From Swiss-Prot:
Gene Ontology MF, one: undecaprenyldiphospho-muramoylpentapeptide beta-N-acetylglucosaminyltransferase activity
Catalytic activity: di-trans,octa-cis-undecaprenyl diphospho-N-acetyl-alpha-D-muramoyl-L-alanyl-D-glutamyl-meso-2,6-diaminopimeloyl-D-alanyl-D-alanine + UDP-N-acetyl-alpha-D-glucosamine = di-trans,octa-cis-undecaprenyl diphospho-[N-acetyl-alpha-D-glucosaminyl-(1->4)]-N-acetyl-alpha-D-muramoyl-L-alanyl-D-glutamyl-meso-2,6-diaminopimeloyl-D-alanyl-D-alanine + UDP + H(+)
Gene name linked to the record: murG
Protein name per Swiss-Prot or TrEMBL: UDP-N-acetylglucosamine--N-acetylmuramyl-(pentapeptide) pyrophosphoryl-undecaprenol N-acetylglucosamine transferase
Pathway(s) this gene product operates in, as recorded in its UniProt entry: Cell wall biogenesis; peptidoglycan biosynthesis
Binding-site residues, UDP-N-acetyl-alpha-D-glucosamine: T14, G15, G16, N126, R162, S190, I243, A262, L263, T264, V265, S266, E267, Q287
Chain segments annotated as coiled-coil in the UniProt record: none
Native organism: Photobacterium profundum (strain SS9)
GO terms for biological process, alphabetical: carbohydrate metabolic process; cell division; cell wall organization; lipid glycosylation; peptidoglycan biosynthetic process; regulation of cell shape
Family that this chain belongs to: Belongs to the glycosyltransferase 28 family. MurG subfamily.
Keywords recorded for this protein, A-Z: Cell cycle, Cell division, Cell inner membrane, Cell membrane, Cell shape, Cell wall biogenesis/degradation, Glycosyltransferase, Membrane, Peptidoglycan synthesis, Transferase
Keyword Nucleus: no
């Protein structure tokens, strides 16, 4: 009797790593695969993954950036300890394939899998490869990337996104008969973005009754953002800390003003929604490069944070009537790789058969 194939997913830290991993896990679960997760106990995967019916094991590992000299000297011992922890879990569960989706956990987990003779599939979500994935790419059986350029000559498969997002109606259907104020969705990620929380209330005041706004302010920023809107405008608006049903929010929106993390960019493309991106400023310009493809194909605009002003953003939005926004939405959907979960799953299955 053949036992079910087994996949160990290594992902942690942020939704940009965890949610694509969950999308692939769900796809393979539907095909009878057993899934287990490797993460850290103090990050979001510890709560989120079990809610999806997936068992999770934890190793102790943290990033090295910004650490003091004493901690840096102790780091090699901690990394070896984390590798040994991961190898113990791998030996006990015996996965057929290990999938690394990024985060600190992927480093020790990937090395442990390689030492155990288990094939490692890497998936890089961003247009600039993270340090962990750069190292692991040397020992991985297969390296995949969401956007071209993270690795030279590696397969571009897109970012796996949630099925409720890929299942949304087409932009043409959603925009048909839509009237009234332009619907602006503001998203700064689960932690919010202070610059957007400060700027959008002023933008609302400048645009007046031309717009209505749904604003995700992020944890701990609800009250101050709501007060900023009350001070600036009487434009219809809704401010929430989080948006639980992001697919419904995308379906509602005419345009999204947001950061350009890898998952956000991929979800907007899959949903078919135009965007104005305000990338997080980072020395490697990771978020700006994530957004570049949608900007180039006419699905999005980009304003660097240093150039962002309420007046400038209001002027940009004022030029985007609903017909233009529909064209941007159509371009976004046409640029999407909506079967990224299938593509990653197919690679995993091919390695499991060897």
């Amino acid at each position: 009797m053949n036992k079910n194939k087994r996949l160990l997913v290594m992902a942690g830290g942020t939704g940009g790593h965890v949610f694509p991993g969950l999308a692939v896990a769900k796809k393979l679960q539907q095909e009878g695969w057993e899934i287990r997760w490797l993460g850290t106990a103090d990050r979001m995967e510890a709560d989120l993954v079990p809610k999806h019916g997936i068992e999770i094991d934890f190793i102790k590992v943290k990033g090295l950036r910004g650490q003091g000299i004493i901690r840096m000297l102790a780091a090699p011992f901690k990394i070896v300890g984390a590798i040994l922890q991961a190898r113990k879990y791998i030996k006990a569960w015996q996965p057929d394939v290990v999938l690394g989706m990024g985060g600190y956990v992927s480093g020790p987990g990937g090395i442990a899998a390689w030492l155990s003779g288990v094939p490692v599939v890497l998936h890089e979500q961003n247009a600039v490869a993270g340090l962990t994935n750069q190292w692991l790419s040397r020992i991985a059986a297969k390296v995949l990337q969401a956007f071209p350029g993270a690795f030279a000559n590696k397969d571009v498969v897109g970012n796996p996104v949630r099925q409720d997002v890929t299942a949304l109606a087409s932009p043409q259907e959603r925009f048909a008969g839509r009237q009234g104020p332009v619907r602006i969705l503001v998203m700064g990620g689960s932690q919010g973005a202070r610059i957007l929380n400060q700027t959008l209330p002023e933008v609302a005041g400048l645009l007046g009754d031309k717009v209505t706004i749904w604003h995700q302010a992020g944890k701990g920023s609800l009250q101050v953002t709501e007060q900023a809107y009350a001070k600036s405008t009487n434009v219809p608006h809704k401010v929430t800390e989080f948006i639980d049903d992001v697919a419904a929010a995308y379906a509602w929106a005419d345009v999204v003003v947001c950061r350009s993390g890898a998952l956000t960019v991929s979800e907007l493309s899959a949903a078919g929604v135009g965007a104005i991106f305000v990338p997080f400023m980072h020395k490697d310009r990771q978020q700006a490069l994530n957004a570049d493809h949608l900007v180039q194909c006419g699905a999005a605009k980009m304003i660097e944070q240093m150039d962002l002003t309420a007046a400038g953003l209001a002027e940009e939005l004022n030029q985007l009537d609903r017909e233009v926004l529909k064209q941007m939405a159509v371009a976004a959907r046409e640029a999407a790789i909506v079967d990224a979960d299938v593509r990653v799953a197919d690679v995993i299955k091919s390695l499991a058969r060897k």
